[in-house]
């Protein structure tokens, strides 16, 4: 088994460290990793220290425990030469799909990407795969339906047909079939011919319905990538046909303007935890964030996703278990999936979790009532209702004066220990988001890194050497990825940036200790710091893309007195 776990580009090192922690926690042997732009590949096929039965636990543990993985794909077979459609068709015939396709006649979704290859027409490639599925794969997986699952119904039918023949031919001593199965409906049960026929009809309908459901369950999604005339097929192991995407943690989630997905919210918090506090010139003081030693405030709360992920981390809840609906994955429909072992695995990792938040206050605020309502709804859906989780409608400056100072001094008989400073973690408005959605956009961007050749998807730039230094990527290409921020700004947004910077400048460090913002506007740093005149500056932790927009995670650093 070879797994490819995807993530937003530039967050690969975070995912790499998280997966290593997950595997260690699950007491699984660490395999060799390969890190690509946009994902990590784990090859379990040739590792002599990993048994065949143990391999499925890697898939189970990452899918249930990862906060960062956006999808998990299983490589189907080896990569193959693919210079023309003839080679493509021949190699499709050689691949063994049966393990990763449910017994369904529904055509799969197919995603195709091509790079620097003679085959570049993605629709033509997709059409040929669908044709191959209908002509070859569908028949193979259909005959593999495990009819033993329907054994109780089949035994009842066999028994009823035996009794029917006995009624219809009472003097035929050679009637056989069903003698050992009479106990199913009882030897003493007297049934008329009509009653038996009615029961047979009902059971046949039931059997057909069960088999029909088996044949019409959602099919695995297929990914075909052809890079420099080399093809590779993968199937999505986690996203179910019902559309339960791996990164989604809340069913029917209410969203506000420009939401951030759960995986990116977790990545932001993990990156902050992984960074270190700078004290003076060239010295550090340890982690910038300990969720147990600070209160959290998101002044642009949106849908409440950052608060939601922070709570989940505080409670040490598994991403797959911090939902009020049963999470299902596509691999549960695979032919060789062991349901019994998987259920035992889930029991071992999903321990009861208290929804109570102790010793930490979490505040979300926003000027938009829709955002407040969405946040309350989403956290309530997950069972998070506690006096330490608070939401307020209002401007951040008024919330700071009216709520943050007050909550910082609360002490509920020593139980909550709320005499702790607040840390701001927030996703700022940045031009194309929220505030100036009715303003005309300027078609220009501001570079924040030198221009360089973009790394191709799938190009290997880092191999695991057990070096846990944060972002120790050993490729000059990776250090110079092209990054641009939005350069458009409205008067309202400019005013917001200035007032936000003034609040930080005037704040008491015993009340507001740290500030982390996800920024996507090139003007934010200069405006919020008053062109360097305020008593703080911004330091970039990382950058990535959020919904097609380039963003940077910044941390506030106080200037020496």
From Swiss-Prot:
Pfam families: UPF0020 (PF01170). Keywords: Coiled coil. This is Putative uncharacterized protein DDB_G0293380. Residues 187-217 form a coiled coil. Induction: Down-regulated by Pseudomonas aeruginosa, PAO1 strain and PA14 strain infection. GO terms for molecular function: tRNA (guanine) methyltransferase activity. The keyword Coiled coil applies. One of its GO terms (biological process) is tRNA methylation.
């Amino acid at each position: 088994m070879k797994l490819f776990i995807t993530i937003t580009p530039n967050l690969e090192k975070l995912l790499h460290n998280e997966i290593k922690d997950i595997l260690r926690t699950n007491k699984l042997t660490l395999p060799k990793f390969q890190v690509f732009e946009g994902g990590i590949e784990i090859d379990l096929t040739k590792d002599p220290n990993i048994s065949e039965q143990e391999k499925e636990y890697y898939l189970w543990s990452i899918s249930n425990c990862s906060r960062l993985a956006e999808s998990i794909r299983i490589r189907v077979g080896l990569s193959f030469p693919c210079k023309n459609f003839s080679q493509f068709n021949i190699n499709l015939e050689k691949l063994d799909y049966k393990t990763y396709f449910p017994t369904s006649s529904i055509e799969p979704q197919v995603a195709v990407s091509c790079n620097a290859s003679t085959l570049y027409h993605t629709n033509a490639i997709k059409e040929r795969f669908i044709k191959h599925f209908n002509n070859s794969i569908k028949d193979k997986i259909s005959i593999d339906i495990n009819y033993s699952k329907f054994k109780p119904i089949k035994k009842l039918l066999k028994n009823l047909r035996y009794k029917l023949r006995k009624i219809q031919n009472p003097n035929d001593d050679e009637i056989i079939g069903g003698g050992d199965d009479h106990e199913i409906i009882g030897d003493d049960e007297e049934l008329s011919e009509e009653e038996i026929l009615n029961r047979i009809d009902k059971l046949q309908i039931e059997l057909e319905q069960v088999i029909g459901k088996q044949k019409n369950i959602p099919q695995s999604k297929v990914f075909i990538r052809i890079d420099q005339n080399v093809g590779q097929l993968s199937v999505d192991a986690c996203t179910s046909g019902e559309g339960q995407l791996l990164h989604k943690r809340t069913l029917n989630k209410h969203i506000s303007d420009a939401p951030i997905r759960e995986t990116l919210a977790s990545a932001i918090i993990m990156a902050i935890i992984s960074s270190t506090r700078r004290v003076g010139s060239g010295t550090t003081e340890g982690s910038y964030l300990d969720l147990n030693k600070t209160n959290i405030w998101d002044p642009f709360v949106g849908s409440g996703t950052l608060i939601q992920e922070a709570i989940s981390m505080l409670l040490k809840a598994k991403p797959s278990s911090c939902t009020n609906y049963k999470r299902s994955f596509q691999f549960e429909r695979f032919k060789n999936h062991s349901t019994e072992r998987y259920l035992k695995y889930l029991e071992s990792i999903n321990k009861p979790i208290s929804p109570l938040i102790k010793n930490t206050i979490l505040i979300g605020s926003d000027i938009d009532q829709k955002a407040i309502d969405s946040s309350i709804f989403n956290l309530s859906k997950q069972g998070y209702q506690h006096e330490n989780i608070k939401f307020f409608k209002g401007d951040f400056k008024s919330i700071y004066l009216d709520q943050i100072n007050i909550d910082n001094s609360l002490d509920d008989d020593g139980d909550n220990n709320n005499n702790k400073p607040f840390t701001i973690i927030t996703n700022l408005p940045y031009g194309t988001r929220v505030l100036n959605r009715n303003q005309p956009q300027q078609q220009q961007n501001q570079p924040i890194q030198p221009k360089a050749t973009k790394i191709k998807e799938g190009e290997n730039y880092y191999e695991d050497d057990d070096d846990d230094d944060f972002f120790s990527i050993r490729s000059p290409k990776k250090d110079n990825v092209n990054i641009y921020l939005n350069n458009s700004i409205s008067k309202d947004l400019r005013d917001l940036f200035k007032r936000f910077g003034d609040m930080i400048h005037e704040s008491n460090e015993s009340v507001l200790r740290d500030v982390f913002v996800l920024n996507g506007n090139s003007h934010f740093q200069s405006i919020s710091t008053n062109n360097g005149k305020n008593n703080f500056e911004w330091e970039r932790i990382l950058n990535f893309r959020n919904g097609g927009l380039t963003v940077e995670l910044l941390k506030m650093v106080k200037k020496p007195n």
